[in-house]
Curated annotation (Swiss-Prot):
Pfam families given in the database record: Cytochrom_B_C (PF00032), Cytochrome_B (PF00033)
Mode of membrane association: Multi-pass membrane protein
Source organism of the structure: Paragalago granti
Protein name: Cytochrome b
Residues reported to bind a ubiquinone: H201
Segments traversing the membrane: 33-53, 77-98, 113-133, 178-198, 226-246, 288-308, 320-340, 347-367
Binding site for heme b b562: H83, H182
Length: 379
């Protein structure tokens, strides 16, 4: 058995990636989220495949086909809710994974980090298009509002929006192409995840101390396979608790009303995992400025390694940076809350303040804190 594992070309690749992979001996449970993201992607692809067998991407029947899946298809309701809530779990793991990377300085692995940011954009695009497919009120108006943002691009904006819509409004052509893209993108995400892993295995994993662990490595199996298995059990327990007890907790009631272009919902808002970016978009009165802030709120992750001048990558021994980090987390939670509130005072001013603080912490306070901590090290 050992010979096959170490000699067969395919088995050898798996062996080097998941079995005999040298891993730091001190990585904590924060390193579990990579494997959990892989599990979430598998759940989404499998449930999505079964949903696609019964879904019709036509404006007249899309809403009815989702209702049909829930009512008439054998176990259709659980497949539909696993897919919808699986997306929420995906984003929870994604945010935890990025948060760990920021805290422990994993952004110093530039290729791995930048592929990760591309993955984040791709997952966000996939989730947005998936939200349009049930063709409820929030699906339709969410698609209209978000795609309309591209019209803010000077000179070519209007043509670009009409090209994406496939007409002069969000209609059948839009729904059909969104379904096609939503189907193919998860496989592109899987390929990008492979590249992400490839770059990670070039450098080896980071660890909480931020110190090189080359002198102290242990094999990935059985130590971290068992550890990952615990994460898998907890994730599945959380997901099934959500699906079986309160499947609509994270959804919007408006999406149980079929799409009606003549009736605008009082508050158009995306799924909870986009609310922080939506709050940043809404906090700027100018359309183009809002779109740029929205894109930059995610793209800013690629800039994090540039002003990083600290002697230590990890924040484990840097209390000032830790304070800033948790301020950033609190700020993102405030932005998420504001994104779900109506556009009226005091929410407008809170959203604008939180947006300024978000960029101020990342672009100005974090680099300054790095310099200050370097000075303190010399004392």
């Amino acid at each position: 058995m050992t010979n096959i594992r170490k000699q067969h070309p395919l088995a050898k690749m798996i062996n080097h990636s998941f079995i005999d992979l040298p891993a730091p001996s001190n990585i904590s449970s924060w390193w579990n989220f990579g494997s959990l993201l892989g599990l979430c992607l598998m759940i989404q692809i499998i449930t999505g495949l079964f949903l696609a067998m019964h879904y019709t991407s036509d404006t007249t029947t899309a809403f009815s086909s989702v209702t049909h899946i829930c009512r008439d298809v054998n176990h259709g309701w659980i497949i539909r809710y696993l897919h919808a809530n699986g997306a929420s779990m995906f984003f929870i793991c994604l945010f935890m994974h990025i948060g760990r990377g920021l805290y422990y300085g994993s952004f110093t692995f530039l290729e791995t980090w930048n592929i990760g940011v591309i993955l984040l954009f791709t997952v966000m695009a996939t989730a947005f298009m998936g939200y349009v497919l049930p063709w409820g009120q929030m699906s339709f108006w969410g698609a209209t509002v978000i795609t309309n943002l591209l019209s803010a691009i000077p000179y070519m904006g209007t043509n670009l929006v009409e090209w994406i819509w496939g007409g002069f409004s969000v209609d059948k052509a839009t729904l059909t192409r969104f379904f096609a893209f939503h189907f193919i993108l998860p496989f592109i995400i899987a390929a990008l995840a492979m590249v992400h892993l490839l770059f990670l295995h070039e450098t080896g994993s980071n660890n909480p101390s931020g110190i090189s662990s080359d002198s102290d490595k242990i094999p990935f199996h059985p130590y971290y396979t068992i550890k990952d298995l615990l994460g898998v059990i907890l994730l599945l327990l959380s997901l099934f608790s959500l699906v079986l007890f309160s499947p609509d907790l994270l959804g919007d009631p408006d999406n149980y009303t079929p799409a009606n272009p003549l009736n605008t919902p009082p508050h158009i808002k995306p799924e909870w995992y986009f609310l922080f970016a939506y709050a940043i978009l809404r906090s700027i009165p100018n359309k183009l400025g809002g779109v740029l802030a929205l894109v930059f709120s995610i793209l800013i992750l690629t800039l994090i390694p540039l002003p990083h001048t600290a002697k230590q990558a990890s924040m484990m021994f840097r209390p000032l940076s830790q304070c800033l980090y948790w301020m950033l987390v609190a700020d993102l939670l405030i932005l998420t809350w504001i994104g779900g509130q109506p556009v009226e005072n005091p929410f407008i001013i809170i959203g604008q303040t939180a947006s300024i603080i978000y960029f101020f912490i990342i672009l100005i306070l974090m680099p300054l804190t790095n310099l200050l901590e370097n000075k303190l090290l010399k004392w």
